[in-house]
């Protein structure tokens, strides 16, 4: 018999710097169901993408991390994108942070460096995955739910 341990976790605060269309965003998240509404291109999907990025350290929108760096910031010689989540897991308060740093490399080039911190301590993605959990379903994934077994 396998015992399943349920984790009580909720996101309390999300902070974004130079992420997608946001130069700065600070959101206090209430401990209840949250509904994101607004016109197109206002950042609703970007907020969801940021939350997912902090759980998986990859985007569900792109396979190129450089594309999530704010367009205007990416023009600078040194560009930094920062995502921070303050959350509570069971009864423990935690902070997870991801930094994407575009820095000069070679002649006219830039390289992207990713830093991940858990409670202020640098860690590898493998060490941190599973500390902050998120699941995303987008319309493109409908075949996973609705499709025939062979499609899944």
Model-identified regions with their sequence ranges:
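Pre-Walker A-like glycine/lysine-rich segment at the N-terminus of P-loop NTPase domains
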Residues: 2-53, 74
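Short coil-to-helix segment of the ABC ATPase nucleotide-binding domain corresponding to the Q-loop/switch region
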Residues: 48, 151-152
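Nucleotide-state sensing region of NTPase/ATPase domains
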Residues: 56-145, 149-150
């Amino acid at each position: 018999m396998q015992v399943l341990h349920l984790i009580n976790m909720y996101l309390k605060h999300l902070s974004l710097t130079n992420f997608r269309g946001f130069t700065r965003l600070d959101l206090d998240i209430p401990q209840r169901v949250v509904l994101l509404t607004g016109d197109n291109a206002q950042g609703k999907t970007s907020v969801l993408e940021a939350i997912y990025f902090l759980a998986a350290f990859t985007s569900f929108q792109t396979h190129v991390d450089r594309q999530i760096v704010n367009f205007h910031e990416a023009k600078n010689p040194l560009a930094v994108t920062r995502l921070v989540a303050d959350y509570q897991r069971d009864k423990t308060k935690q902070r997870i942070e991801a930094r994407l740093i575009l820095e000069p490399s070679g002649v006219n080039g830039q390289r992207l460096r990713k830093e991940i911190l858990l409670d202020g301590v640098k860690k590898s993605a493998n060490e941190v995955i599973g500390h902050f959990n998120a699941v995303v379903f987008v319309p493109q994934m409908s075949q996973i739910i609705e499709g025939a077994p062979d499609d899944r």
